[in-house]
Amino acid sequence: MFGTMIEIENALPKDIATINVKFIKKIINEVCKGYVTKIVWRDNKYIPPVEEHLKVTLITCFYWAINCIALVVFEENVTKEVLEWMSTFPPIVKDSCIVSRLMDDIVAHEFETERNNVATAVTCHMKEYGTTKEEASEVLWDVVENAWKDMNKEYLNRTDIPASLLVRVINLARMMETMYNEIDGYTDSAILKNRISLLLEKPISF
């Protein structure tokens, strides 16, 4: 992971490389702390309340880090203010992570449970509220829908952050929704073949 940081630093202009990579490393450190917490949960078979679960897994899903890396690598003339904004785990990024994390947990719940991984948000909801898997999934789908509404509102109303950056955050959520829409396309990537083929072979013209 930090080897990748070195590659990014070497690829960036020297006048911004150190500052920008330091910014990314700070976020990666938070991700690694979350990984340690998840290992403890798994080894102790701990099923946290939903809020505690999301406080960690919204970070470890790595989408905040991906947005940070994309900002530094692909966005030109990134200001200090924008970097500081991104470092706060802003609402639109958090909502993007909610979409990604919860959709993954819903569609991959059985697979993750069978391999004794960290409890999914579905399992956490079932334990905390005494719900069935179906009831928990329905509640979490509503959370995903609300996250989409909040992301769209933030995109339309935010004027101090470049629209190109905001839409990149939303596009990541769109990609994850495609990957986890009723299927676990990450675990079984072959099922995404037709969708990828359509994108590459029959793209929609604008």
Language-model region placement:
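Alpha-helical, largely C-terminal catalytic domains
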Residues: 1-206
